[in-house]
Amino acid sequence: MRRILLVLILSLLCLAGFQPALAQQGTDVSAVVNAAFFWMEGCPYCEEVMQTVLPEMQAQFGDQLVVQSFEVGTTDEVNRLYQISASLGLSKEETGVPMIIIGDQVLVGSEQIPTRLPGLIEAALQDGGAEAPDLDRLATAGAGA
């Protein structure tokens, strides 16, 4: 009986000892990263990201990743994208599709997105998540730039 009690106490101590270490290394499972994804019809790079990268990220992060997609198809939408980009520090020359915004971070193109998106999502989750970008505010802020 004494031996069983000792094993039980040691087991509880081990579990209690490992739990804080796991919490520090892991991410908050309730954290959510909201992203804005901009794409254009007929853009092969956009298709690549939409068909390959985003499904992989969704499979990896599940409900902790919410991606809102925005098609850029009209002149007004292109101008709005330029304004949003300007407010985030990008020039017109640096702006393009596909583009993903998470927090104040912007990834552009089919090279940046696959290589940097997983780390950006992980970092945002460790920081407690990322709110959806306020695109109206960003467009207004970038209108004067």
Predicted regions and their residues:
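Bacterial N-terminal signal peptides
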Residues: 7-17
